[in-house]
Amino acid sequence: MIFDTHAHYDDKKFDADRREVLAAMPAKGVSLIVDPGCDGESSRTACALAQEFPFVYAAVGWHPEEWQSWNGESMALLRSLCAQPKVVAIGEIGLDYYWDTEHKALQKEMFERQLSLAIERKLPVIVHDREAHGDCLEIVMNYPEARGVFHCFSGSAEMAKELIRRGWYLGFDGPVTYKSNKKAAEVLAVTPLERILVETDSPYMAPEPCRGKRNDSSLLVYVLEKIAALKGVSAEEMTRITQENGCRLFGIEA
């Protein structure tokens, strides 16, 4: 059964049919989903979905792009939310310099404070790193007790090796299937099977042959098939391995 370790069913793109989509997942071979929050509202929604659906778990956190809504009450809210049942991680947190380079200092502060909370609560983190590889790596190296996954990993093979050496997991999703993405094969070549997680980032980044459509967890089969081919194992074996990896990181009993 498939473990989608990163899907945003709290996203507005699912407003029309959220519950129907989620209810159909077990019949489509999806056994577990982690829904990470991106701010206070989405973190609350992720927690609510985790309470409603037995196979959904939540992560709570403030995405770097949501810096405008970060305020003096944000950490207190996250501290409260991460004590709720079925919250298995702090995330989605990190740095994003693709859209915004004017607020790097604030993004770093948000990232570091949430890393500290994760360490305090003994929770893994889900890291967003877009066009900020050097700073993200430097920050997590400054927090050696932190553990977790670099979601939608887009760094180099050398960065991957350094993170793996430090016990981190790497998340792979739809872009792995894109013909233009040569870097994914290079990274997967140096990534041990036991450090691979699969994810959709639903509703975004649908894999080939569904690129451009709304993504959901059932489409993870295409990502699993591609990674399995690159690693020389069957899709069934890759599904089993990635489920075990996800359960190990997030402390979930399959």
Model-predicted regions and their roles:
Residues 1-254:
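Mid-domain alpha/beta scaffold segments of enzyme catalytic cores
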